[in-house]
């Protein structure tokens, strides 16, 4: 009985303490207002597509980091800080994500692979090492298959496969990831 009373008392104290936390949650108006704590640059791909990216390190080999679904540049922060000592590191926000342009993009692997190609052409990059996590791994694979001349190596971190999504699933992802 004492254990039961002590347990209830513990949970009651925990509940009251949790309810008394007066932490304000700041509403984010847009991704532009988020401080990445990394230098952010922009480049325009095609007409109205602006890509956000961060670039650091001076190594001779370029690592191009591609985030996963629902992610953005800061997910690579610790990797960038460490790897910039030896490599030229670039992390991008894919179209529709983070600080990059939002639009009615096709969100297919071919679209993202072509975006990676155009970004690399603009930056005069060739023989890059594509580093992709989750959907970014899927994009890295698609890019390497479609544009092998661009890619030296790929590094896959818990990559997605080559799933296909129906129209409703694609719309759900768009709605869920839009701010």
Feature map (PLM): residue ranges:
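Alpha/beta-hydrolase fold catalytic core
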Residues: 2-61, 86-87, 125-126
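Conserved Rossmann-like nucleotide-binding pocket used by diverse enzymes
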Residues: 15, 65, 90, 131, ...
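Flexible "cap/lid" loop of the alpha/beta hydrolase fold
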Residues: 138-146, 152-179
